[in-house]
């Protein structure tokens, strides 16, 4: 039997030859560098009719095919266990920009936030500001914290003494410098550039807690505020800031049959530089995604539904736990993703014991009638691009958080056991490779966000740990 060094050299040469003949030049360069394979050996194998000295250099694929044929029965059984998704539905990868997960992507710990935050505190919300310079955090004990990433300092204040409730939602008003605060009493508060409450800038939008909120820029000084609450209403409001004065006008509302589970907004360009908006909402015990259009900049109109089950007689087969709008072809620098043929929705389901992800096509027809009866709303049953199982464990109480990191080419899912990466091309899912000092991120994820510049992510757990992770692209 040949010694290990000879067999290793020959194996490396087989692999290098395979990479070269299949045009995988970048992978070949990395392989040669990491194995220290002499380039001259590869060149000699080409110039000597696939011989290395007197040793014939076989084709790697032929070697593998022969091996499979020799042990075809055991290989057939073994292949069944390699993936939980043997036959994924075909999808136009080029159209939707779907690529394999970027395995060169790495993460490093920036700082453990606990050291500069109130001790023994569970944070229920963590959001980057629009300029990615600050992190806005809300705790279960009533604290609001503004963390300065560059200075590694934090400022906190007991907001519940002023708003008389724990803050559930906390985030930026686009790039205006203003922030919003939504405590659990259904109110909407404004904070100024110094993160202080603005006088006379509080509005009761919902009778009960606001569960979901989206802010969409209309003009330089006005924004749509789209909210859903525990009172089962979807509401559209207009926030205006003029000469230091703030106004919020309630425009439209729709009563929902059950509580909202996700809320997304997509901008529809009209070709004249103006945007209209489509609101995509899911709710409990309803396996459809409902689309509402904002008509005449003031009215919410139910435009269509997208069914996630094929049974037209049933609208409930599982719960939709989270939805995220993505576009892997066009980079998005605005606060609202734009509609294009490559835009799609990623849906996390309630299937047990393992979550499923569904990729959904969005209809391109944006010309909706101004009035439409509910029984005439069109339902699409042919918009599912891919429906696949994951290895993400969950139970009846799981609340997954979906996130998109552009350089990853895939989807991040914060769940009961940590943060998972999901490869949309292969359906592969696995716990994210996070440095050892952040082991607590393998607990239940309570909050997670990715900075606008895509350079950092923040995640907090049920064990009261919270971390900033640096995103290292094209790591070698």
Curated annotation (Swiss-Prot):
Q: Which GO terms describe its biological process?
A: regulation of biosynthetic process
Q: Which InterPro entries does the record associate with it?
A: LisH, UCP007778, WD40_repeat_dom_sf
Q: Where would one find coiled-coil regions in this protein?
A: none
Q: Which domain of life is it from?
A: Eukaryota
Q: Which residues form the LisH domain?
A: 7-39
Q: Which GO terms describe its cellular component?
A: cytoplasm
- Write down the SUPFAM superfamilies for this protein, in alphabetical order: WD40 repeat-like (SSF50978)
Q: What else is known?
A: Present with 1280 molecules/cell in log phase SD medium.
Protein name as catalogued: Uncharacterized protein YGR117C
Origin species, per record, is: Saccharomyces cerevisiae (strain ATCC 204508 / S288c) (Baker's yeast)
